[in-house]
């Protein structure tokens, strides 16, 4: 619970501008891990040079961060939020679980740079994302998806 609270203390700047922060997160993910861009069919054809500032990427990044905000605010009681997310990402989008680990590390970096997430907050965010990803992976296994 303390880890969720530590992360939520720095969540304000994210909530204040989901679109910009989401764009920063996905842009960095695609630049640091170009293979992840292929997992998003609508972004697959966007050249690396055109990723930053792309409105569609920023909009999807906002969607990702809004859902993460819901998960954070649930403080671990997130089964009802996570189950449909796991279902769509396993059965429709086919997103391997490792990609959630990659975006988690990108999020740690962006929140450190843009939201003042200190070393303790970074550890807390890694812990929280570890919990969420473990639960997501358990849902994947229930669905028979070995992503």
Swiss-Prot record:
Its main location: cytoplasm. It catalyses: Fe(III)-heme b-[protein] + nitric oxide + H2O = Fe(II)-heme b-[protein] + nitrite + 2 H(+); H2O2 + AH2 = A + 2 H2O. It holds the Pfam family Globin. The modification N-acetylalanine is found at residue 2. Nitrite binds at residue 60. One of its GO terms (molecular function) is oxygen binding. GO terms for cellular component: extracellular exosome; sarcoplasm. Keywords: Acetylation, Cytoplasm, Heme, Iron, Metal-binding, Muscle protein, Oxidoreductase, Oxygen transport, Transport. It is an enzyme of class 1 (oxidoreductase). Heme b binds at residue 89. Its EC number is 1.7.-.-, 1.11.1.-. Residues 2-141 form the Globin domain. The keyword rRNA-binding does not apply. SUPFAM superfamilies: Globin-like. InterPro entries: Globin (IPR000971), Globin-like_sf (IPR009050), Myoglobin (IPR002335). It is found in: Cytoplasm, Sarcoplasm. One of its GO terms (biological process) is removal of superoxide radicals. O2 binds at residue 60. Monomeric. Belongs to the globin family. Monomeric heme protein which primary function is to store oxygen and facilitate its diffusion within muscle tissues. Reversibly binds oxygen through a pentacoordinated heme iron and enables its timely and efficient release as needed during periods of heightened demand. Depending on the oxidative conditions of tissues and cells, and in addition to its ability to bind oxygen, it also has a nitrite reductase activity whereby it regulates the production of bioactive nitric oxide. This is Myoglobin. It comes from Thunnus albacares.
């Amino acid at each position: 619970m303390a880890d969720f609270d530590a992360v939520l203390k720095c969540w304000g700047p994210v909530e204040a501008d989901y679109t910009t922060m989401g764009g920063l997160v996905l842009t960095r993910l695609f630049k640091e891990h170009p293979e992840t861009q292929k997992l998003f069919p609508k972004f697959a054809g966007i050249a690396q040079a055109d990723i930053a500032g792309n409105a569609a990427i920023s909009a999807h990044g906002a969607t990702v961060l809004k859902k993460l905000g819901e998960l954070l605010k649930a403080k671990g009681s997130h089964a009802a939020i996570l189950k449909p997310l796991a279902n769509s990402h396993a059965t429709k989008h086919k997103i391997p679980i490792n990609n959630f680990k990659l975006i988690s590390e990108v999020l740690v970096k962006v929140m450190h740079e843009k939201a003042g997430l200190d070393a303790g907050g970074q550890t807390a965010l890694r812990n929280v994302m570890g919990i969420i990803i473990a639960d997501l992976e358990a849902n994947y296994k229930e669905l028979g998806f070995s992503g």
